[in-house]
Amino acid sequence: MTKIQSIRSIRVSLPFETGGPRHGMRPSLDAWTKMECVMVRIKTSDGLEGWGEAFGHAMAPGSEAVINQILAPMLVGRDSVAINHRIAELERPLHGLGRSGPLMYALSAIDTALWDLAAQRAHLPLYKFLGGESGVLTKYASLMRYGGDTDAVAQNVERARSYGFRTIKLHETTIPAFRAARNAVELDLSLIHI
């Protein structure tokens, strides 16, 4: 049995700009100046290290706390190989904490790190271990929500296009905001919405 020896969380903070005032999560803030995520490193008794990432934004401190205070104590000393069983074993006693937010972000990081370890044991890159290439994936820019501010929408769509993106994801909810996005760029640019 290959046991989990340690789990470490590492908060990563990168410079970030929203491109203007935004609306949505923590709307009291005019703009973010950093983007955070939490990396997880799992070390095992066979000398390997697996890595995973927990979604961050404003939730990074919560995800980090879940990893350090809840999940790590439940996992250290346990088998690292039976991944689906291990994740299900974690989810059962924690179901009362919900199926979204920092708990799920933290579980996702643990899950990814365990699969990374399995791929290393198979001497394969993780993407090949999980089934290989699935074809061409189109990159896209995912913009913030600008609360219908058509000028901010147009500016940020144009900025994303200038960086080479041909597909842009909008979080806007009004028709004028979509019109502003469409009018800001050529017709061959694709717009998607969540």
Predicted regions and their residues:
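Active-site mouth loops of central-metabolism enzymes
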Residues: 137-152
